[in-house]
Amino acid sequence: MVCPKILMKCKHDSDCLLDCVCLEDIGYCGVS
């Protein structure tokens, strides 16, 4: 899994970069 360690706000996985997913409970992208 490649997920840049950049705090990006998100509402959906498609808002995130590469293999990141949207962690909806915190509203930021991360690794599942």
Swiss-Prot record:
Keyword Secreted: yes
SS bond list: C3-C20, C10-C22, C16-C29
Domain of life according to the entry: Eukaryota
Record has Secreted as a keyword: yes
Site (Reactive bond): K5, I6
One Pfam family in the UniProt entry: Squash
Signal peptide residues on this chain, from the entry's feature table: none
UniProt-annotated location(s): Secreted
UniProt name for this protein: Trypsin inhibitor 2b
